[in-house]
Swiss-Prot record:
The keyword Cytoplasm applies. It comes from Chlamydia felis (strain Fe/C-56) (Chlamydophila felis). Belongs to the PlsX family. Its EC number is 2.3.1.274. This is Phosphate acyltransferase. The lineage of its organism: Bacteria, Pseudomonadati, Chlamydiota, Chlamydiia, Chlamydiales. GO terms for molecular function: phosphate:acyl-[acyl carrier protein] acyltransferase activity. Catalyzes the reversible formation of acyl-phosphate (acyl-PO(4)) from acyl-[acyl-carrier-protein] (acyl-ACP). This enzyme utilizes acyl-ACP as fatty acyl donor, but not acyl-CoA. Homodimer. Probably interacts with PlsY. Pathway: Lipid metabolism; phospholipid metabolism. One of its GO terms (cellular component) is cytoplasm. One of its GO terms (biological process) is fatty acid biosynthetic process. Its main location: cytoplasm. It is found in: Cytoplasm.
Amino acid sequence: MNVQIGIDLMGGDHSPLVIWEVLIDVLNSTASNSHFSFTAFASHEVQEQILSSCTYKECPKIIASDSFVTMDDSPLSAIRKKSSSMALGLDYLKEDKIDAFISTGNTAALITLSRTKIPVFPTVRRPALLVRVPTMRGCAVILDVGANVSVNPEEMLGFARMGLAYRQCIGEKEHPTIGLLNIGSEERKGTEAHRQTFRILRETFQDSFLGNIESGDVFSGSVDIVVADGFTGNIFLKTAEGVFDFLRHILGDKLESDVKRQLDYTIYPGSMVCGLSKLVIKCHGKACGRSLFNGISGSIDLARARVCQRILSSLS
C-alpha cells in the first residue's frame, strides 16, 4: 500500500534540520521501500535552507508555512495561527492529501488542533494519547498518557475500548486483558472516579478486566492494556522513560544486548492520538536519531495497516 506521510519539521526541541536528516535516513534505509513518501511542513526560511542544500535524488515535498507553533503557545494561541506548519499539516490530513501526520511539537496544541480539524469516531467522547511500552512479555498499551487531564468513568471506559480495538487490529493478541492504573490492586483503592471506573470496566469486560494495576506491575506484562487518566498516565510514562534512560546510563556496556532491547522504549512509534478518524502521531519533543527514526517508521507501518479505520470498525 502506498502511503503519504506528513511531518511537521517545526516546534520540537531540536532544529528542523535534525528532523529533516532523520527523514532522509528513513528514505535511505535498506529496510524501507518505495511504497511511501513524505510531505514536510516548515517555515519559508527552513524550506529555502533545505532546498538549497538537498542532495537527495527525489527531495521530499516541503510546504511552506507563515508561522509555527512553539512549545510556549497555549492551545488558543495555536488555533489562532491558522497558517502554522502544524495547522497546514492537519489540513492536508483532513483533505486526504496525506495518510498520517507526525509532530514533535506542543502536545496540547496538537491535541486541540487535531480535534478541531479531524472528526472523532462517533462512539468516542474524547480522544486519548496511546503509547506502547516494553514489558517482560512483550509490550503493553497504555492510554491516556496526556491528552486529557481530567476524565470521568464513562470516558475511561472509552479508553479501554479503544485500547482493546488497537491491540486486536494490530494482531498482537486475540483476547487482550485490561488493567486500571491505580495506587493499589484492591478494588477500594483510588478516588471515587477510579472506584466507579473499576466497577464499569468489570461489568463491561468481565474476565478480560483483571482489576487495578500498580505502576511497577505494568512492566511484568500482567495486562495488555493499561487504562489511565491523562494526568496519571503522563506521569507514569515520563517516569518510566527516565528510569529506562537512567539504567542504560549507569549500567552502560554491562547490559547485555537483549536486555538493552527490552529496555528500549524508542523502538515503538510515538503516541497515537487514538479516537480520531485519521492518523495523528505525537513523537517526543526531544526525539532525534534512532528514536525519531523508529517513530517515523512505526507511523508508516500504522498508516499501511489502516489502523484508524480498523479501530473504527472494531468500535462500531
